[in-house]
Amino acid sequence: MAIEGGERTCGVHELICIRKVSPEAVGFLSAVGVFIILMLLLFLYINKKFCFENVGGFPDLGSEYSTRKNSQDKIYNSYMDKDEHGSSSESEDEALGKYHEALSRTHNSRLPLADSRQRNYAWETRQKYSPLSAEYDGYSSEASIDEGNCIQRMRRTPPLDELQPPPYQDDSGSPHLSCTPSEIGDSKCEFSHCSNSPRCSYNKCPSEGSTGHEIESFHNKGYEEDVPSDSTAVLSPEDMSAQGSSSQLPKPFDPEPEAKYGTLDVTFDYDSQEQKLLVTVTAVTDIPTYNRTGGNSWQVHLVLLPIKKQRAKTSIQRGPCPVFTETFKFNHVESEMIGNYAVRFRLYGVHRMKKEKIVGEKIFYLTKLNLQGKMSLPVILEPSYNHSGCDSQMSVSEMSCSESTSSCQSLEHGSVPEILIGLLYNATTGRLSAEVIKGSHFKNLAANRPPNTYVKLTLLNSMGQEMSKCKTSIRRGQPNPVYKETFVFQVALFQLSDVTLILSVYNKRSMKRKEMIGWISLGLNSSGEEELNHWTEMKESKGQQVCRWHALLES
């Protein structure tokens, strides 16, 4: 094909080459090429990174070899440097000979240390699973960096019985049990059957091939003695079990010579003219240990026997020697009948989420009381004994029944229903707290089975209008129920003498209407003299709870 009017002619392929490529195509092809190159570089980088990544959890097996290789190279270079700066007559073979000689000396100096560490690691790993070391775990050892290598060395080590020499025997023929601590800081206890006392050894483990005498240092409470021996005698657990009673192990603890249940520091002050008794509980000492009581909070309960209507309890204090310094008043204690009265003290261990536990108790008879002035004396508590019942005689010892078994009643009321109430008023906050503690001799008049009872509390003003009301939960099938529920009423100080608190005990029946077992009222319109005295004592107690038994009135 020819082009007319031109000086030269060209073929078809030359026409195609003459055409120009568009800049967009050039840019696109360049971008694709750059992208492919970047992806290739990224792939090579990632591949190289993964190849040199350490597998998690496995030690670097070549680190030790590389470190040793570097040290050898340094020694070799140092000798080569000396050879270059020294005389030129020394050949390279002689330098290599010096290098190998120095390397062998370095290896020989490090060999005993490595062997001792290897044996120590094997003994340490085996000792962790020994029953002998489990008995005396008072010594701790730190973990080594080469723990994985220690396990491998232990597998290649022959059993302990094959390594140990025959037991060393002294002049009396008694074998010695010794222990050897490793260089990483752990140590084991040893025992000497001839001295019957444990001794700890702090010496270095001898090598297997040692034939010389080793010096063992025995430390026993500051006393040091050097005893020469042929080798360290180590008894295996099988040898210990075979000896049986011949090996005397130390006791973990010495039992107390005499059990202690607590000692109260108490002060008595009796006023014969007003017929009242003031009892001050100062502190408690000689409290049992935590292992016996299981708690570290304490409370003292007091009750005047035999009537058991006047009760008191201290605040809760913590510590091994709690200090209370609280005074309680008991009224109507006639001087003519003082020989028939007694005060029972009980120390309780208080747990946050558990029931109170009696630690000890003591009944102090007022016949020992000094009727003139104060008398301070310690009251040593004794273990508590629960009595199943009591007679209706006017004997204090027979009326000192357990507080948990409320079947023991007072002489005045016989078997009438009674309720134990605790009152407390805080003048600062204006809060009246009424605690329903327990009931006694609740009866079901319609059936012979025990009743399902609850207590309803109602607070009335001076006009008889209801200010507040609340009730306890139901106690099912209990003639002597224990409630221990506290209710708080907001009463101003100037209104305290004008309010009435009514407590009603009901028997909850399923298909019938509820039945009232009895009731009492305290305050302005008190139901009796005892209830009025209880209210008056509550106002005079200055923030301390006053507990009293009250006989219920029939509806």
Curated annotation (Swiss-Prot):
Segments in the Extracellular topological domain: 1-24
Tissue: Highly expressed in fetal and adult brain tissue.
Record's keyword terms, sorted: Disease variant, Membrane, Neurodegeneration, Repeat, Signal-anchor, Transmembrane, Transmembrane helix
Lineage: superkingdom: Eukaryota
Main location: membrane
Membrane topology, from the record: Single-pass type III membrane protein
Transmembrane segments: 25-47
Ranges facing Cytoplasmic side: 48-555
Region described as Disordered: 157-179, 222-257
Subcellular location: Membrane
GO CC entries: membrane
Stored Pfam families: C2 (PF00168)
Domain C2 stretches: 260-379, 415-550
Single Gene Ontology MF annotation: phospholipid binding
Role description: May be involved in the trafficking and exocytosis of secretory vesicles in non-neuronal tissues. Is Ca(2+)-independent.
Recorded disease: Spinocerebellar ataxia, autosomal recessive, 11: A form of spinocerebellar ataxia, a clinically and genetically heterogeneous group of cerebellar disorders. Patients show progressive incoordination of gait and often poor coordination of hands, speech and eye movements, due to degeneration of the cerebellum with variable involvement of the brainstem and spinal cord. SCAR11 is associated with psychomotor retardation.
Family of the protein in this entry: Belongs to the synaptotagmin family.
Subunit organization: Homodimer. Can also form heterodimers.
Protein name listed in UniProt: Synaptotagmin-14
Organism of provenance: Homo sapiens
